[in-house]
């Protein structure tokens, strides 16, 4: 199971430090989410920046890292321009960019751009077809790299998971403990799904993790408990794990340091 983090922090300097510790400690993928309007659970360097721009910056600072967006709200993005951005970033990251796309979770983001929340699935399906056609298109500038375009994964709820299984695309689930993920993973694989990834919030220590609008389903605990939790995700068939280690300098640093120094050597 491949493991990476979102370098969420209070300051730009700590976002860089988190990335350094992670990459040097074997947490080799740097993930960012996506959003349009201000969200009290994703502020500043903890998820508010434009994701593709920040990922390009991180790819330049840490050229051995894989980078990924989890997940781009596809109905809010022009597929032609996203294909250009994705192929560019894939080249900048040495062939190490993962493009995860979703129909969208926040109604206000979509409605602010004139898209009814109920229409997002239809818009997503049309845009996904366009995106998959455009990414390998050699007439675009830049077209795909010599190793091909970046991989496309899907993220979302049950309907999107079914799309992923039907299309043979990887699916990224999110915000579920191993117990909660178990039945989801079984449904995905029973439907013919081929590759399951997961995004979760994992923080060192014993404390409650609450959000303003996000129900995190966060996992907290010791290094030993982390080893057990990550092992359980792997047993469920998760092939790629994206960890949100916190949303401030102190909490994120503490968690990433423990993951790199004590957890990864045991996996």
Region annotations inferred by a language model:
Residues 1-267:
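Active-site-adjacent structural elements that line small-molecule/cofactor binding pockets in enzymes
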């Amino acid at each position: 199971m491949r493991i990476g983090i979102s370098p969420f922090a209070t300051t730009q300097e700590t976002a860089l430090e988190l990335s350094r510790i992670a990459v040097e400690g074997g947490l080799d993928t740097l993930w960012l989410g996506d959003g349009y309007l201000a969200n009290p659970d994703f502020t500043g360097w903890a998820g508010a920046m434009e994701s593709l721009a920040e990922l390009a910056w991180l790819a330049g600072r840490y050229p051995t890292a894989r980078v990924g967006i989890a997940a781009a709200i596809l109905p809010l993005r022009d597929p032609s321009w996203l294909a250009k951005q994705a192929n560019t970033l894939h080249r900048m990251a040495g062939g190490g960019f993962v493009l995860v796309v979703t129909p969208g979770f926040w109604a206000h983001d979509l409605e602010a751009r004139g898209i009814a929340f109920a229409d997002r699935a239809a818009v997503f399906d049309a845009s996904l077809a366009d995106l998959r056609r455009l990414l390998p298109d050699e007439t675009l500038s830049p077209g795909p790299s010599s190793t091909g375009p970046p991989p496309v994964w899907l993220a979302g709820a049950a309907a999107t998971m079914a799309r992923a299984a039907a299309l043979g695309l990887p699916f990224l689930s999110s915000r579920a403990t191993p117990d909660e993920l178990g039945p989801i993973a079984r449904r995905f694989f029973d439907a013919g799904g081929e590759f399951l990834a997961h995004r979760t919030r994992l923080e060192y220590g014993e404390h409650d993790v609450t959000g303003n609008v996000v129900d995190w389903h966060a996992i907290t605990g010791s290094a030993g408990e982390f080893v057990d939790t990550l092992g359980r995700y792997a047993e469920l068939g998760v092939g790629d794990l994206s960890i949100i280690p916190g949303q401030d300098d102190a909490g994120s640093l503490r968690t990433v340091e423990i993951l790199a120094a004590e957890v990864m050597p045991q996996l």
